[in-house]
């Protein structure tokens, strides 16, 4: 599970955002029509990636994918899912230093200072907090309990635009180097996992 309930930022109106990973039968790749790389549903706000697509995005340090691997709310896992979680550090690399800041910057540029979308502003700050924790400690910060009150104040529009941009600038400035992250992900370990998973799905 991801979203506000995983971050510790849920309110009474919050949806339940589910994200998952599935393994397509190996024989389905032998056909001309390949299996989907992702599917939506069957529940509302549910989205799942085929395992190879998921691993590819994780190796690229996609923030959403990396936070899925560290989500504290897990509803169901299979043996393949347990193994995926056990190798989650293999996906980490210094490129996350760029992707987290880049994603947050893209959100910031879409905000209108005259009429800010405060929920989006909150998640922009939350993403920077998560990425900074990842750079310093080697794993993203998913639950933001220590920052909950201030983040929710942003969402309610109780902080001024200047205060939000100042908080953003302080966080961006702190991204001076990748810190605890390795230069490259452990692609060999990820490929071994994929091969074993495909063999098990024959």
Task: Give, region by region, the residue ranges found by the protein language model.
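Catalytic metal-binding acidic patch
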Residues: 3-40, 124
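Phosphate/oxyanion-binding loops and surfaces in catalytic or ligand/nucleic-acid-binding neighborhoods
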Residues: 25, 61, 134
């Amino acid at each position: 599970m991801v979203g506000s309930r995983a971050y510790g930022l849920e309110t009474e109106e919050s949806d339940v955002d589910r994200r998952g990973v599935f393994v397509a039968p190996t024989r389905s790749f032998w056909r001309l029509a390949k299996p989907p790389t992702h599917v939506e549903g069957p529940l509302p706000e549910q989205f799942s990636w085929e395992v190879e697509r998921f691993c590819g995005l994780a190796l690229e340090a996609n923030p959403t994918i990396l936070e899925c691997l560290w989500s504290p709310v897990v509803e169901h896992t299979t043996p393949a899912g347990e193994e995926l979680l056990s190798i989650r550090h293999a996906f980490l690399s210094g490129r996350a230093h760029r992707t987290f800041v880049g994603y947050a910057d893209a959100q910031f540029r879409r905000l209108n200072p005259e009429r800010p979308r405060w929920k989006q502003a909150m998640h922009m700050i939350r993403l920077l907090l998560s990425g900074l924790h990842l750079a310093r400690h080697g794993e993203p910060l998913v639950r933001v309990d220590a920052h909950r009150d201030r983040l929710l104040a942003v969402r309610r529009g109780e902080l001024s635009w200047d205060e939000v941009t100042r908080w953003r600038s302080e966080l961006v400035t702190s991204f001076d180097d990748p810190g605890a992250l390795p230069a490259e992900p452990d692609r060999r370990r990820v490929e071994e996992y994929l091969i074993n998973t495909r063999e098990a799905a024959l």
